[in-house]
Amino acid sequence: MALEKLGKALNNALRKLARSSTVDEATIKEVVRDIQRALIQADVNVRLVLDLTKRIEKRALEEEPPTGVSKKEHIIKIVYEELTKFLGTEAKPIEIKEKPTVLLTVGIQGSGKTTSIAKLARYFQKRGYKVGLVCSDTWRPGAYQQLKQLVEPFGIEVFGDPEEKDAIKLAKEGVEHFREKGVDIIIVDSAGRHKEEKSLIEEMKQISAAIKPHEVILVIDGTIGQQAYNQALAFKEATPIGSIIVTKLDGSAKGGGALSAVAATGAPIKFIGVGERIDDLEPFDPKRFVSRLLGLGDIQGLLEKFEELQKQQEFREEDLEKFLKGKFNLKDMYAQLEAMQKMGPLKQILQMIPGMGYSLPDDAVRVGEERLKKFKVIMDSMTEEELEHPEIINYSRIKRIARGSGTSIQEVRELLHQYNQMKKMFKSMDKRKLSKMARKFNLGGFGL
């Protein structure tokens, strides 16, 4: 998950509150200090942290919770609301109003711009849009080839000419090429040679004048932390149609600093990069993002992922219900894990369920691709009866399965252990408690 370290630290602060016997001024101040420490360690600007935590402390000390809501729950809601406000409050999606809509992307060298463009193209393609990419990066050797390699498996065309040195000419020709082809969205990749904001903005203005984009997107590297403020501010002041993608939030300790710095400028964050896969680009919604960060889940995000799986006809509603109630067998487990894998790691999906958050044992959910392949080989050596009723698998059956699959007894046991862990985990979920929590945080019902 994006900003997992920060999320765990914030979640621990809220757990401390939940475990305390009384909620007095000292308890509130201690929780606020924990939140301050977590945010400062994530490279969030100290002044911004102090302003935020002062608001949290003031509200927590002065506000009376509504009827039916405990003081602890109300303080958690205050933390959720203030963090959401801190990161921009509302989601601001890219609007596709005209055909074609032209998007120009810019970014400092090493920001992850080219990869983000491929992810953005895939994001729109999955939503039914026909997308064309224009590579006008004439500076970086291999930029055109890299972009082609990333999107060709998905049938997305890239216009470019590695021999051409005039970026503006390439951008104009590329936009015209895709206009004639009748695509819905044209994404233009600009040069990635700039090491500072001034020259980047100069080029952005030149290309913008030539191709007249509907929106200009600045790609910011999340690992630069609060330094992102200067980039975002200079960009916001230079164009009225600008939006931002913050990348590399999956592995950076400074991602919180980058996100908060950009939000402080008022520049709209449209997407965040949360992993290396081409599907690891998320529309940025502060409410849903903070909800996941605090371990409160993201029901809307979960439903959207399952809807995508259903569109691929790999995941039916009754399958999902069986899975979430812990009433699945080995056959179901493999089919659903394989389908879920296409939408991201299982842990990422389970973190969208309120209450699961950071309490998930990693061993119970981190089923990597290699292990999945091995599990399939093992399951291929099982009988239909064993797949449907794993409880009948005794030691002699384990020996036979291991022999037939070319694996060890230990590996067969590992599969069965993984299966039992997952069943146990899902069965232990308190559905009523989670539903009550979701309603209190206006996170929507989730029909479990």
UniProtKB/Swiss-Prot annotation:
Keywords for the protein's UniProt record, in alphabetical order: Cytoplasm, GTP-binding, Hydrolase, Nucleotide-binding, Ribonucleoprotein, RNA-binding, Signal recognition particle
GO biological processes: SRP-dependent cotranslational protein targeting to membrane
Catalytic activity: GTP + H2O = GDP + phosphate + H(+)
Protein name: Signal recognition particle 54 kDa protein
Positions annotated to bind GTP: 107-114, 189-193, 247-250
Protein's cellular compartments: Cytoplasm
Cysteine disulfide links: none
Recorded family membership: Belongs to the GTP-binding SRP family. SRP54 subfamily.
SMART domains in the record: AAA, SRP54, SRP54_N
UniProt function note: Involved in targeting and insertion of nascent membrane proteins into the cytoplasmic membrane. Binds to the hydrophobic signal sequence of the ribosome-nascent chain (RNC) as it emerges from the ribosomes. The SRP-RNC complex is then targeted to the cytoplasmic membrane where it interacts with the SRP receptor FtsY.
Domain characteristics, as noted in the entry: Composed of three domains: the N-terminal N domain, which is responsible for interactions with the ribosome, the central G domain, which binds GTP, and the C-terminal M domain, which binds the RNA and the signal sequence of the RNC.
Database matches in HAMAP family: SRP54
Gene Ontology CC terms: signal recognition particle
Main subcellular location of this protein, as a coarse class: cytoplasm
Gene Ontology terms for molecular function: 7S RNA binding; ATP hydrolysis activity; GTP binding; GTPase activity
Keyword Ion transport: no
EC number: 3.6.5.4
Subunit structure: Part of the signal recognition particle protein translocation system, which is composed of SRP and FtsY. Archaeal SRP consists of a 7S RNA molecule of 300 nucleotides and two protein subunits: SRP54 and SRP19.
Metal-binding keyword on record: no
